A protein has these predicted regions:
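N-terminal secretory targeting modules
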Residues: 2, 9, 19-197, 207-209, ...
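Conserved SGNH/GDSL esterase-like catalytic core that processes O-acyl groups on lipids
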Residues: 28, 47-53, 76, 80-85, ...
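Hydrophobic membrane-targeting alpha-helices
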Residues: 13-17
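Catalytic His-Asp segment of secreted/periplasmic serine-dependent ester chemistry enzymes
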Residues: 275, 312-393
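Surface-exposed amphipathic alpha-helices with a cationic face
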Residues: 292-300
Length: 393
Protein backbone atom coordinates (compact mmCIF):
# COMPACT_ATOMS: atom_id res chain seq x y z
CA UNK A 1 0.00 0.00 0.00
CA UNK A 2 2.79 2.39 0.97
CA UNK A 3 4.57 1.57 -2.31
CA UNK A 4 1.41 2.37 -4.31
CA UNK A 5 0.96 5.69 -2.50
CA UNK A 6 4.61 6.57 -3.07
CA UNK A 7 4.33 5.73 -6.78
CA UNK A 8 1.19 7.86 -7.10
CA UNK A 9 2.91 10.73 -5.32
CA UNK A 10 5.90 10.54 -7.65
CA UNK A 11 3.61 10.56 -10.70
CA UNK A 12 1.77 13.62 -9.38
CA UNK A 13 5.04 15.41 -8.65
CA UNK A 14 6.28 14.59 -12.15
CA UNK A 15 3.13 16.06 -13.69
CA UNK A 16 3.41 19.20 -11.58
CA UNK A 17 7.06 19.50 -12.56
CA UNK A 18 6.17 19.09 -16.23
CA UNK A 19 3.58 21.86 -15.98
CA UNK A 20 6.05 24.13 -14.21
CA UNK A 21 8.47 23.73 -17.13
CA UNK A 22 5.97 25.25 -19.57
CA UNK A 23 4.36 28.66 -19.93
CA UNK A 24 1.79 30.34 -22.13
CA UNK A 25 3.70 32.31 -24.73
CA UNK A 26 2.34 34.55 -27.47
CA UNK A 27 3.28 33.27 -30.92
CA UNK A 28 1.26 35.99 -32.66
CA UNK A 29 -0.37 39.17 -31.43
CA UNK A 30 -1.64 42.49 -32.71
CA UNK A 31 -2.41 45.87 -31.16
CA UNK A 32 -6.17 46.41 -31.10
CA UNK A 33 -7.61 49.83 -31.89
CA UNK A 34 -10.77 51.71 -32.75
CA UNK A 35 -11.66 52.24 -36.41
CA UNK A 36 -10.10 55.52 -37.53
CA UNK A 37 -12.36 56.11 -40.53
CA UNK A 38 -15.34 54.51 -42.28
CA UNK A 39 -12.97 52.59 -44.55
CA UNK A 40 -11.65 50.70 -41.53
CA UNK A 41 -14.95 48.79 -41.30
CA UNK A 42 -16.38 46.37 -43.89
CA UNK A 43 -19.13 47.70 -46.13
CA UNK A 44 -21.12 44.65 -45.03
CA UNK A 45 -22.07 44.30 -41.36
CA UNK A 46 -20.24 41.59 -39.45
CA UNK A 47 -23.54 40.58 -37.82
CA UNK A 48 -24.71 37.10 -38.81
CA UNK A 49 -21.68 36.67 -41.08
CA UNK A 50 -18.59 34.47 -40.95
CA UNK A 51 -15.20 36.17 -41.02
CA UNK A 52 -12.08 34.24 -42.04
CA UNK A 53 -8.79 35.87 -41.02
CA UNK A 54 -5.23 34.69 -41.64
CA UNK A 55 -2.36 35.07 -39.19
CA UNK A 56 1.33 34.16 -39.45
CA UNK A 57 2.71 32.58 -36.27
CA UNK A 58 6.31 32.56 -35.09
CA UNK A 59 6.78 29.51 -32.83
CA UNK A 60 4.83 26.27 -32.88
CA UNK A 61 3.23 24.17 -30.17
CA UNK A 62 0.86 21.32 -29.40
CA UNK A 63 -1.57 23.25 -27.22
CA UNK A 64 -2.92 26.74 -27.88
CA UNK A 65 -5.50 29.33 -26.92
CA UNK A 66 -6.85 32.39 -28.71
CA UNK A 67 -7.59 35.77 -27.18
CA UNK A 68 -10.54 37.70 -28.58
CA UNK A 69 -10.98 41.39 -27.79
CA UNK A 70 -13.93 43.76 -27.62
CA UNK A 71 -11.86 46.33 -25.73
CA UNK A 72 -12.35 49.13 -28.23
CA UNK A 73 -16.11 48.79 -28.76
CA UNK A 74 -19.05 50.33 -26.94
CA UNK A 75 -21.51 47.44 -27.39
CA UNK A 76 -21.24 43.67 -26.80
CA UNK A 77 -20.12 41.35 -29.59
CA UNK A 78 -21.81 37.96 -29.92
CA UNK A 79 -19.55 35.12 -31.05
CA UNK A 80 -21.50 32.03 -32.15
CA UNK A 81 -18.48 29.88 -33.00
CA UNK A 82 -14.76 30.00 -33.76
CA UNK A 83 -12.68 27.39 -35.54
CA UNK A 84 -9.06 27.31 -36.65
CA UNK A 85 -7.35 25.41 -39.45
CA UNK A 86 -4.14 25.36 -41.44
CA UNK A 87 -4.51 28.08 -44.07
CA UNK A 88 -4.28 27.32 -47.77
CA UNK A 89 -4.22 29.71 -50.70
CA UNK A 90 -6.56 32.69 -50.37
CA UNK A 91 -9.54 31.75 -48.23
CA UNK A 92 -8.94 27.99 -48.59
CA UNK A 93 -8.19 25.82 -45.56
CA UNK A 94 -7.09 22.27 -44.87
CA UNK A 95 -10.41 20.91 -43.61
CA UNK A 96 -8.70 17.92 -41.99
CA UNK A 97 -7.11 20.29 -39.46
CA UNK A 98 -10.28 22.13 -38.41
CA UNK A 99 -10.57 22.53 -34.65
CA UNK A 100 -13.47 24.33 -32.98
CA UNK A 101 -12.48 26.45 -29.99
CA UNK A 102 -14.64 26.74 -26.88
CA UNK A 103 -15.26 29.17 -24.03
CA UNK A 104 -15.71 27.39 -20.70
CA UNK A 105 -16.90 24.39 -22.69
CA UNK A 106 -19.33 26.34 -24.91
CA UNK A 107 -18.83 27.19 -28.57
CA UNK A 108 -20.43 30.60 -28.10
CA UNK A 109 -19.61 33.64 -26.00
CA UNK A 110 -20.70 37.24 -25.67
CA UNK A 111 -17.86 39.67 -25.01
CA UNK A 112 -18.86 42.79 -23.15
CA UNK A 113 -17.55 46.20 -24.25
CA UNK A 114 -14.09 46.98 -22.95
CA UNK A 115 -13.34 43.29 -22.29
CA UNK A 116 -11.25 40.48 -23.76
CA UNK A 117 -11.65 36.72 -23.35
CA UNK A 118 -9.58 33.59 -23.90
CA UNK A 119 -10.76 30.39 -25.49
CA UNK A 120 -10.20 27.17 -23.61
CA UNK A 121 -6.86 25.50 -24.27
CA UNK A 122 -7.05 23.24 -27.32
CA UNK A 123 -4.80 20.53 -28.73
CA UNK A 124 -3.46 21.52 -32.15
CA UNK A 125 -0.32 20.71 -34.11
CA UNK A 126 0.79 24.28 -34.76
CA UNK A 127 3.95 24.40 -36.85
CA UNK A 128 6.54 27.18 -36.50
CA UNK A 129 6.10 30.02 -39.02
CA UNK A 130 2.88 28.60 -40.44
CA UNK A 131 -0.18 30.50 -41.64
CA UNK A 132 -3.27 29.81 -39.54
CA UNK A 133 -6.87 30.51 -40.51
CA UNK A 134 -9.29 31.78 -37.83
CA UNK A 135 -12.98 31.68 -38.77
CA UNK A 136 -15.46 33.53 -36.55
CA UNK A 137 -19.23 33.20 -36.95
CA UNK A 138 -20.86 36.30 -35.49
CA UNK A 139 -24.27 36.95 -34.02
CA UNK A 140 -24.94 40.60 -33.26
CA UNK A 141 -21.95 42.94 -33.52
CA UNK A 142 -21.21 46.58 -32.72
CA UNK A 143 -21.34 49.05 -35.63
CA UNK A 144 -17.69 49.87 -34.83
CA UNK A 145 -15.72 46.73 -34.09
CA UNK A 146 -12.45 46.32 -32.23
CA UNK A 147 -9.96 46.17 -35.07
CA UNK A 148 -6.39 46.29 -36.25
CA UNK A 149 -6.39 48.43 -39.38
CA UNK A 150 -3.16 47.24 -40.99
CA UNK A 151 -3.37 43.46 -41.26
CA UNK A 152 -1.38 43.45 -44.54
CA UNK A 153 -3.29 40.20 -45.05
CA UNK A 154 -6.60 39.59 -46.81
CA UNK A 155 -9.62 38.75 -44.66
CA UNK A 156 -12.78 37.19 -46.11
CA UNK A 157 -16.43 37.76 -45.14
CA UNK A 158 -19.36 35.54 -46.09
CA UNK A 159 -23.05 35.56 -45.26
CA UNK A 160 -24.26 33.12 -42.62
CA UNK A 161 -22.36 30.30 -40.95
CA UNK A 162 -19.27 28.86 -42.58
CA UNK A 163 -19.12 25.07 -42.63
CA UNK A 164 -15.53 23.75 -42.58
CA UNK A 165 -15.90 21.41 -45.56
CA UNK A 166 -17.94 23.81 -47.70
CA UNK A 167 -16.53 26.49 -49.97
CA UNK A 168 -16.17 29.89 -48.31
CA UNK A 169 -18.39 32.12 -50.47
CA UNK A 170 -16.85 35.50 -49.71
CA UNK A 171 -19.03 38.55 -50.35
CA UNK A 172 -16.31 41.01 -49.34
CA UNK A 173 -12.54 41.10 -48.90
CA UNK A 174 -10.43 43.62 -46.98
CA UNK A 175 -7.08 44.07 -45.24
CA UNK A 176 -8.15 44.48 -41.62
CA UNK A 177 -8.43 42.18 -38.59
CA UNK A 178 -11.39 42.20 -36.21
CA UNK A 179 -11.57 40.95 -32.61
CA UNK A 180 -8.54 38.65 -32.76
CA UNK A 181 -5.82 39.90 -30.39
CA UNK A 182 -3.35 37.11 -29.58
CA UNK A 183 -2.59 33.45 -30.16
CA UNK A 184 -0.63 31.71 -27.42
CA UNK A 185 0.99 28.29 -27.25
CA UNK A 186 2.13 26.23 -24.31
CA UNK A 187 5.91 26.48 -24.65
CA UNK A 188 8.97 25.54 -22.58
CA UNK A 189 9.71 28.02 -19.81
CA UNK A 190 13.03 28.82 -21.50
CA UNK A 191 11.33 30.11 -24.67
CA UNK A 192 12.27 33.66 -25.67
CA UNK A 193 9.45 35.96 -26.77
CA UNK A 194 10.19 39.36 -28.32
CA UNK A 195 7.43 42.00 -28.24
CA UNK A 196 7.99 44.78 -30.79
CA UNK A 197 6.56 48.25 -30.17
CA UNK A 198 6.33 50.46 -33.22
CA UNK A 199 4.43 52.48 -35.80
CA UNK A 200 3.72 51.84 -39.49
CA UNK A 201 7.31 50.76 -40.17
CA UNK A 202 6.77 47.89 -37.72
CA UNK A 203 3.13 47.43 -38.81
CA UNK A 204 4.43 46.85 -42.33
CA UNK A 205 3.43 49.79 -44.52
CA UNK A 206 5.13 49.10 -47.85
CA UNK A 207 5.18 45.30 -47.51
CA UNK A 208 3.47 42.92 -49.93
CA UNK A 209 -0.12 41.96 -49.08
CA UNK A 210 -0.44 38.31 -48.01
CA UNK A 211 3.32 37.72 -48.08
CA UNK A 212 3.88 38.24 -44.33
CA UNK A 213 7.15 40.10 -44.92
CA UNK A 214 7.20 42.76 -42.23
CA UNK A 215 10.61 43.07 -40.57
CA UNK A 216 9.23 41.19 -37.56
CA UNK A 217 8.14 38.29 -39.82
CA UNK A 218 11.60 38.19 -41.38
CA UNK A 219 13.19 38.30 -37.92
CA UNK A 220 11.11 35.31 -36.78
CA UNK A 221 12.03 33.37 -39.94
CA UNK A 222 15.72 34.22 -39.59
CA UNK A 223 15.61 32.94 -36.01
CA UNK A 224 14.25 29.67 -37.40
CA UNK A 225 10.85 29.74 -35.69
CA UNK A 226 12.57 29.04 -32.37
CA UNK A 227 11.97 32.50 -30.87
CA UNK A 228 8.52 34.07 -30.61
CA UNK A 229 8.32 37.48 -32.29
CA UNK A 230 5.10 39.45 -31.87
CA UNK A 231 4.23 42.66 -33.69
CA UNK A 232 2.51 45.42 -31.71
CA UNK A 233 2.96 48.17 -34.27
CA UNK A 234 0.19 50.59 -35.23
CA UNK A 235 0.27 52.66 -38.41
CA UNK A 236 0.40 56.41 -37.79
CA UNK A 237 1.05 55.89 -34.09
CA UNK A 238 3.11 58.23 -31.91
CA UNK A 239 4.91 57.77 -28.62
CA UNK A 240 3.61 60.92 -26.92
CA UNK A 241 0.64 62.42 -28.82
CA UNK A 242 -0.69 63.52 -32.18
CA UNK A 243 -0.76 60.19 -33.99
CA UNK A 244 -3.47 57.66 -34.82
CA UNK A 245 -4.89 55.48 -32.02
CA UNK A 246 -3.75 55.60 -28.40
CA UNK A 247 -0.09 56.69 -28.23
CA UNK A 248 2.55 54.27 -27.02
CA UNK A 249 2.74 56.19 -23.74
CA UNK A 250 -0.85 55.06 -23.06
CA UNK A 251 -0.88 51.60 -24.64
CA UNK A 252 2.47 50.24 -23.46
CA UNK A 253 1.10 48.33 -20.48
CA UNK A 254 -1.74 46.73 -22.44
CA UNK A 255 0.00 46.04 -25.73
CA UNK A 256 3.46 45.07 -24.45
CA UNK A 257 3.58 44.19 -20.76
CA UNK A 258 0.31 42.23 -20.75
CA UNK A 259 1.47 39.83 -23.48
CA UNK A 260 2.10 36.32 -22.20
CA UNK A 261 5.63 34.94 -22.01
CA UNK A 262 7.45 38.10 -23.08
CA UNK A 263 11.17 38.01 -22.26
CA UNK A 264 12.46 40.78 -24.55
CA UNK A 265 11.08 44.06 -25.89
CA UNK A 266 12.18 46.13 -28.88
CA UNK A 267 11.17 49.81 -28.71
CA UNK A 268 11.26 51.18 -32.25
CA UNK A 269 9.02 54.21 -32.34
CA UNK A 270 9.25 58.00 -32.55
CA UNK A 271 9.33 59.01 -36.21
CA UNK A 272 5.74 60.29 -36.17
CA UNK A 273 6.44 62.42 -33.11
CA UNK A 274 9.43 63.91 -34.93
CA UNK A 275 7.49 64.34 -38.17
CA UNK A 276 4.88 66.43 -36.36
CA UNK A 277 7.38 68.96 -34.94
CA UNK A 278 6.46 72.61 -35.55
CA UNK A 279 9.16 74.23 -33.35
CA UNK A 280 12.84 73.65 -32.67
CA UNK A 281 12.15 70.09 -31.53
CA UNK A 282 13.79 70.34 -28.11
CA UNK A 283 10.60 69.38 -26.28
CA UNK A 284 10.00 66.40 -28.58
CA UNK A 285 13.52 65.11 -27.91
CA UNK A 286 12.99 65.42 -24.17
CA UNK A 287 9.57 63.75 -24.23
CA UNK A 288 10.70 60.85 -26.41
CA UNK A 289 13.69 60.04 -24.22
CA UNK A 290 11.53 60.50 -21.11
CA UNK A 291 9.14 57.78 -22.27
CA UNK A 292 11.92 55.54 -23.54
CA UNK A 293 13.33 55.62 -20.00
CA UNK A 294 9.89 54.90 -18.53
CA UNK A 295 9.30 51.96 -20.90
CA UNK A 296 12.73 50.53 -20.09
CA UNK A 297 12.13 50.91 -16.36
CA UNK A 298 8.81 49.07 -16.60
CA UNK A 299 10.45 46.24 -18.52
CA UNK A 300 13.31 45.94 -16.05
CA UNK A 301 10.85 45.75 -13.15
CA UNK A 302 9.33 42.66 -14.78
CA UNK A 303 12.68 41.07 -15.58
CA UNK A 304 12.31 41.79 -19.29
CA UNK A 305 15.32 42.74 -21.41
CA UNK A 306 14.75 45.86 -23.51
CA UNK A 307 16.41 47.07 -26.69
CA UNK A 308 16.14 50.37 -28.54
CA UNK A 309 15.75 50.61 -32.29
CA UNK A 310 17.19 53.76 -33.86
CA UNK A 311 14.83 55.82 -36.01
CA UNK A 312 15.34 55.21 -39.72
CA UNK A 313 16.13 58.03 -42.19
CA UNK A 314 13.36 60.01 -43.90
CA UNK A 315 15.05 62.51 -46.21
CA UNK A 316 12.99 63.17 -49.39
CA UNK A 317 9.75 62.54 -47.45
CA UNK A 318 7.35 65.21 -46.15
CA UNK A 319 8.78 64.75 -42.64
CA UNK A 320 12.20 66.03 -43.60
CA UNK A 321 13.81 69.37 -42.73
CA UNK A 322 17.08 70.34 -41.11
CA UNK A 323 15.27 70.70 -37.77
CA UNK A 324 13.55 67.32 -38.04
CA UNK A 325 16.82 65.65 -39.01
CA UNK A 326 18.65 67.19 -36.08
CA UNK A 327 16.04 65.84 -33.66
CA UNK A 328 16.33 62.37 -35.24
CA UNK A 329 20.10 62.47 -34.79
CA UNK A 330 19.78 63.64 -31.18
CA UNK A 331 17.27 60.93 -30.29
CA UNK A 332 19.27 58.23 -32.09
CA UNK A 333 22.42 59.19 -30.21
CA UNK A 334 20.52 58.75 -26.94
CA UNK A 335 19.25 55.33 -28.07
CA UNK A 336 22.75 54.19 -29.04
CA UNK A 337 24.37 55.23 -25.77
CA UNK A 338 21.63 54.90 -23.14
CA UNK A 339 22.29 52.72 -20.12
CA UNK A 340 18.54 52.18 -19.83
CA UNK A 341 18.65 49.75 -22.75
CA UNK A 342 20.24 46.32 -22.78
CA UNK A 343 21.29 46.95 -26.37
CA UNK A 344 20.70 48.97 -29.52
CA UNK A 345 19.38 47.64 -32.83
CA UNK A 346 20.78 50.29 -35.14
CA UNK A 347 18.13 50.29 -37.88
CA UNK A 348 19.37 53.75 -38.93
CA UNK A 349 22.82 52.42 -39.69
CA UNK A 350 21.40 49.30 -41.35
CA UNK A 351 19.10 51.14 -43.80
CA UNK A 352 20.78 54.48 -44.55
CA UNK A 353 22.35 55.25 -47.91
CA UNK A 354 26.17 55.16 -47.57
CA UNK A 355 26.32 58.21 -49.86
CA UNK A 356 23.65 60.15 -47.94
CA UNK A 357 23.08 58.91 -44.41
CA UNK A 358 20.01 61.13 -43.97
CA UNK A 359 18.12 59.02 -46.55
CA UNK A 360 17.12 55.39 -46.95
CA UNK A 361 18.93 53.35 -49.57
CA UNK A 362 17.02 54.02 -52.78
CA UNK A 363 16.64 50.32 -53.54
CA UNK A 364 15.09 49.77 -50.10
CA UNK A 365 12.58 52.64 -49.96
CA UNK A 366 8.85 52.64 -50.76
CA UNK A 367 8.13 56.36 -50.26
CA UNK A 368 11.34 57.60 -48.58
CA UNK A 369 9.71 57.20 -45.16
CA UNK A 370 8.77 53.51 -45.26
CA UNK A 371 11.02 50.72 -46.53
CA UNK A 372 9.86 48.37 -49.27
CA UNK A 373 9.87 44.58 -49.05
CA UNK A 374 13.62 44.40 -49.69
CA UNK A 375 14.24 47.01 -47.00
CA UNK A 376 12.12 45.14 -44.47
CA UNK A 377 13.99 41.94 -45.29
CA UNK A 378 17.28 43.68 -44.53
CA UNK A 379 15.87 45.08 -41.28
CA UNK A 380 14.53 41.73 -40.11
CA UNK A 381 17.78 39.92 -40.80
CA UNK A 382 19.74 42.70 -39.10
CA UNK A 383 17.47 42.59 -36.02
CA UNK A 384 17.80 38.80 -35.75
CA UNK A 385 21.59 39.00 -35.94
CA UNK A 386 21.66 41.74 -33.28
CA UNK A 387 19.37 39.72 -31.01
CA UNK A 388 21.61 36.66 -31.22
CA UNK A 389 24.62 38.81 -30.37
CA UNK A 390 22.79 40.21 -27.33
CA UNK A 391 22.22 36.65 -26.06
CA UNK A 392 25.98 36.09 -25.92
CA UNK A 393 26.49 38.97 -23.50
Amino acid sequence: MRKILMTSLLVCLALVSLGAQNKWTATWATAVERPFSASDMPKTSLSNHSLRQIIHVSIGGKKLRLQLSNEMSEQPVEIKSVYIADAGKGEAIDASTVTYLTFNGSRSVTIEPGKAVYTDAAAYKLKPLQRLSVTIYYGQTPPKATTHRGSRTTSFLMEGESKPKAAFAAVEKFEHWYNIAALEVEAPASTRCIACLGNSITDGRGTTTDMQNRWTDVMAETLGGKVAVINLGIGGNSVVSGGISAPASERFNRDILSQQGVTDVIIFQGVNDIGGIKDDGARTSRMLTKFYRLFAKKCREKGIRVYGGTITPFKNSSYYSAVHEQVRQTVNQWIRTSEYYDGCIDFDKATSDPKDKEALREEWQADWLHPNAAGYKAMGEFAAKAFLEFQKE
